[in-house]
C-alpha cells in the first residue's frame, strides 16, 4: 500500500484518479497546485511510504503552480508519477522539450507500443489507452527511458534510478483497457528502492577495465555524483580512469545531461538565443573576451544567456569580472530571464544553478589535474541554449566537444581553439568544428577571413578583475585598444554566423561599428542597475 500525495492541477480527472487508487487500498491525499511547495514537502515527510503523483491539467507545465518546484526539489528523493500534464512536467524537468502535438485529442483511444518492461511488464502490446492532450514531449534526454510511443510521439518515460515516470495518456480512464493493472504495477515499481552502490559497481568496473561507458551509464554515474552518493575514492578512481583512457563524447554528454537534470530550473525562452563561453584553463590570462563579446553581441541584436563561474586557473573569470562591474551574481532565474528578454543578455552563475558540484570539489582539489569536470562548464548552461560558441583549452578537444554537442541536441554550434587560447583569435589560425543540423564540419580561420589585422597574443594580456573591468569599460565605451576591438569583433562575428549571418567580414565590420558607438556599455550599466 502506498501513501500518495496527489497534486491537483485543477482538473476533474484528478478525482477519477483518486477513486481508482483508493479502490485498490492506497491512501490518497489531494492538494491543489497553488499550495506552496514547501508545505507539500513537509506533508510528504510525515508519510510512511510517500509517492508524489502529478495529475493531468490544462495549460503548460511552467504555469502549473508549485509543480515545477516540487520536481526540482524532490526528484531522486522519493517516487514521482506524472500523468498527462504531470508527464510533460517530468520531461521538461529532465531537460526535454514540450510542444504542440499537431492535433487536439479529447478522449481518443489509441493503441500504443511499449517495451514490456517495468510497469508495462505482461501488458497487452499494443495497449489501448485514452489520450486527452494537445502537447507532447520530445528531445527526451538520455536519463529518461522512452518506454511507450504512438506514431513517433512519446507516450511514457521512466527514470529507473530516480523512480520517476510519466504517462502522456490517462491510465485511470475506462478507455485504457488495463489501466488499473498499469497503475498498480507502476506503484510497485516506484517503491522498489535501488541501492546506489549496487547499481554503480558494474559501471565502475567498466572504467577500471578501460572500457567506454554508454551515455546512459555515464548519466547514471554522474547523477550519483551530484547527489553525493559516491565515495570520494570511487569518484577519484572513476575520473582518473576516464582521463587516462580519454573521455568519449557519449561519456561527456551523459555527465552533462546528469548535471542539467539536477540543475535549478531556468525559464527557457522560445526565441533563438546563444551562449559564448570557454573552458578556461588555457593559461593565457587574457582579458575576458567572451564576457565582453556577450555584451557586444546583445548590442548587435543577438540574445546571449552566458553561463560562467569564478576563475580557477586565471586571475579573472567571467563572474569575477561581472562582480567588479557591480552585476549581481545571485540574480534569480525570473529576473535573469527578464534581462535576456529586455537587454538581450543575462549571466547565469554556475554555483547558483549547480549545487551538486560541491560533492565533487574536494576530490577535484586533491587530484590537482584536469578531469572531465573541466570541460563540463560550457555544456551545462541551465537555459539550454540552441546555439553556442565554445572555446576549449586544447586542440585535441575541439572535435570531441563538437560531437558531444551533437549528442546533446544543439541546433548549431562551433567549438574553437587558437594558438593556446580557448576562443577565436587573430595571432594564429583558429581550429573550428562547426555543428549544423547534425553535421560537423572542420575548418580553420585566420585574421584574413574576418578582414581584420592580426595582433600578438601578448596584446590581449589581462590582469585582476578590477584591471580587466577598466580595460573593458574603455573598450565597450568605444575607446578601446585596437587589438581588443579586433578580438571581440572576431568572436562576435563567429557568433553571428551561428545565427545565420554567414559573411564573417561583414559581421566583423558590423561589430566594430557597434563597439565604437559605445552602445555595448549601456548593456553593462543596465544589467548592473537591476541589482
UniProtKB/Swiss-Prot annotation:
Pathway, per record: Amino-acid biosynthesis; L-tryptophan biosynthesis; L-tryptophan from chorismate: step 1/5; Amino-acid biosynthesis; L-tryptophan biosynthesis; L-tryptophan from chorismate: step 2/5
Cellular component per GO, a single term: anthranilate synthase complex
Catalytic activity, as annotated: chorismate + L-glutamine = anthranilate + pyruvate + L-glutamate + H(+); N-(5-phospho-beta-D-ribosyl)anthranilate + diphosphate = 5-phospho-alpha-D-ribose 1-diphosphate + anthranilate
Binding site for L-glutamine: 57-59, 88, 134-135
Active site: residue positions: 84 (nucleophile), 170 (for gatase activity), 172 (for gatase activity)
Glycosyltransferase among keywords: yes
Region annotated Anthranilate phosphoribosyltransferase, chain positions: 202-531
Entries under InterPro entries matching the protein: Anthranilate_Pribosyl_Tfrase, Class_I_gatase-like, GATASE, Glycosyl_Trfase_fam3, Glycosyl_Trfase_fam3_N_dom, Glycosyl_Trfase_fam3_N_dom_sf, Nuc_phospho_transferase, TrpG/PapA_dom
Enzyme Commission no: 4.1.3.27, 2.4.2.18
Domain Glutamine amidotransferase type-1: 3-196
GO molecular function terms noted in the UniProt entry: anthranilate phosphoribosyltransferase activity; anthranilate synthase activity; magnesium ion binding
BP term (GO), one: L-tryptophan biosynthetic process
Keywords: Allosteric enzyme, Amino-acid biosynthesis, Aromatic amino acid biosynthesis, Glutamine amidotransferase, Glycosyltransferase, Lyase, Multifunctional enzyme, Transferase, Tryptophan biosynthesis
UniProt activity-regulation remark: Cooperatively feedback inhibited by tryptophan.
Record note on quaternary structure: Heterotetramer consisting of two non-identical subunits: a beta subunit (TrpG) and a large alpha subunit (TrpE).
Family, as annotated: In the C-terminal section; belongs to the anthranilate phosphoribosyltransferase family.
Primary role: Part of a heterotetrameric complex that catalyzes the two-step biosynthesis of anthranilate, an intermediate in the biosynthesis of L-tryptophan. In the first step, the glutamine-binding beta subunit (TrpG) of anthranilate synthase (AS) provides the glutamine amidotransferase activity which generates ammonia as a substrate that, along with chorismate, is used in the second step, catalyzed by the large alpha subunit of AS (TrpE) to produce anthranilate. In the absence of TrpG, TrpE can synthesize anthranilate directly from chorismate and high concentrations of ammonia.
Listed PANTHER family: ANTHRANILATE PHOSPHORIBOSYLTRANSFERASE (PTHR43285:SF2)
Name of the protein described by the UniProt record: Bifunctional protein TrpGD
Organism of provenance: Escherichia coli (strain K12)
Amino acid at each position: 500500500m502506498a501513501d500518495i500525495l496527489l497534486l491537483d492541477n485543477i482538473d476533474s480527472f484528478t478525482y477519477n484518479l483518486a477513486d481508482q487508487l483508493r479502490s485498490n487500498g492506497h491512501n490518497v491525499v489531494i492538494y491543489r497546485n497553488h499550495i506552496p511547495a514547501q508545505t507539500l514537502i513537509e506533508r510528504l515527510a510525515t508519510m510512511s511510504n510517500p509517492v508524489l503523483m502529478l495529475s493531468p491539467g490544462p495549460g503548460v507545465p511552467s504555469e502549473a503552480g508549485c509543480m515545477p518546484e516540487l520536481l526540482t526539489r524532490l526528484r531522486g528523493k522519493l517516487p514521482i508519477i506524472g500523468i498527462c500534464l504531470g508527464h510533460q512536467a517530468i520531461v521538461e524537468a529532465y531537460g526535454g522539450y514540450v510542444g504542440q502535438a499537431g492535433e487536439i485529442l479529447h478522449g481518443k483511444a489509441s493503441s500504443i507500443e511499449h517495451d514490456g518492461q517495468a510497469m508495462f511488464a505482461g501488458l497487452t502490446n499494443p495497449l489501448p489507452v485514452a489520450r486527452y492532450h494537445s502537447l507532447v514531449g520530445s528531445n527526451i534526454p538520455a536519463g529518461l527511458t522512452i518506454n511507450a510511443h504512438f506514431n513517433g510521439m512519446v507516450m511514457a518515460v521512466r527514470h529507473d534510478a530516480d523512480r520517476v515516470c510519466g504517462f502522456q495518456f490517462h491510465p485511470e480512464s475506462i478507455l485504457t483497457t488495463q489501466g488499473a493493472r498499469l497503475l498498480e504495477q507502476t506503484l510497485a515499481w516506484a517503491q522498489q528502492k535501488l541501492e546506489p552502490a549496487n547499481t554503480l559497481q558494474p559501471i565502475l568496473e567498466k572504467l577500471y577495465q578501460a572500457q567506454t561507458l554508454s551515455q546512459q551509464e555515464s548519466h547514471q554515474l554522474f547523477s550519483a555524483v551530484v547527489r553525493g552518493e559516491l565515495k570520494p575514492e570511487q569518484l577519484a578512481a572513476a575520473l582518473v580512469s576516464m582521463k587516462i583512457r580519454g573521455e568519449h563524447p557519449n561519456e561527456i554528454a551523459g555527465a552533462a545531461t546528469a548535471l542539467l537534470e539536477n540543475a535549478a530550473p531556468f525559464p527557457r525562452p522560445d526565441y533563438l538565443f546563444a551562449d559564448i563561453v570557454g573552458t578556461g584553463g588555457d593559461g593565457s590570462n587574457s582579458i575576458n573576451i567572451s564576457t565582453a563579446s556577450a555584451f557586444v553581441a546583445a548590442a548587435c541584436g543577438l540574445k546571449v544567456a552566458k553561463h560562467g563561474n569564478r576563475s580557477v586557473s586565471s586571475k579573472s573569470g567571467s563572474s569575477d569580472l561581472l562582480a567588479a562591474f557591480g552585476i549581481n551574481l545571485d540574480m534569480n532565474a525570473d529576473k535573469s530571464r527578464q534581462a535576456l528578454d529586455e537587454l538581450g543578455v543575462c549571466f547565469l552563475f554556475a554555483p547558483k544553478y549547480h549545487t551538486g558540484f560541491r560533492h565533487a570539489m574536494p576530490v577535484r582539489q586533491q587530484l590537482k589535474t584536469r578531469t572531465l569536470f573541466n570541460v563540463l562548464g560550457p555544456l551545462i548552461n541551465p537555459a539550454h541554449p540552441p546555439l553556442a560558441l565554445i572555446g576549449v583549452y586544447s586542440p585535441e578537444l575541439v572535435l570531441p566537444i563538437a560531437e558531444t554537442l551533437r549528442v546533446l541536441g544543439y541546433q548549431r554550434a562551433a567549438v574553437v581553439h587558437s594558438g593556446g587560447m580557448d576562443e577565436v583569435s587573430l595571432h594564429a589560425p583558429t581550429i573550428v568544428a562547426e555543428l549544423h543540423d547534425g553535421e560537423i564540419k572542420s575548418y580553420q580561420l585566420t585574421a584574413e577571413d574576418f578582414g581584420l589585422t592580426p595582433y600578438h597574443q601578448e596584446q590581449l594580456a589581462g590582469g585582476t578583475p578590477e584591471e580587466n573591468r577598466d580595460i573593458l569599460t574603455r573598450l565597450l565605451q568605444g575607446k578601446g585598444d585596437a587589438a581588443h576591438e579586433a578580438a571581440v569583433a572576431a568572436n562576435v562575428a563567429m557568433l553571428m554566423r551561428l545565427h545565420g549571418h554567414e559573411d564573417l567580414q561583414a559581421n566583423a565590420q558590423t561589430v566594430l561599428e557597434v563597439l565604437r558607438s559605445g552602445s555595448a556599455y549601456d548593456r553593462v550599466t543596465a544589467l548592473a542597475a537591476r541589482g
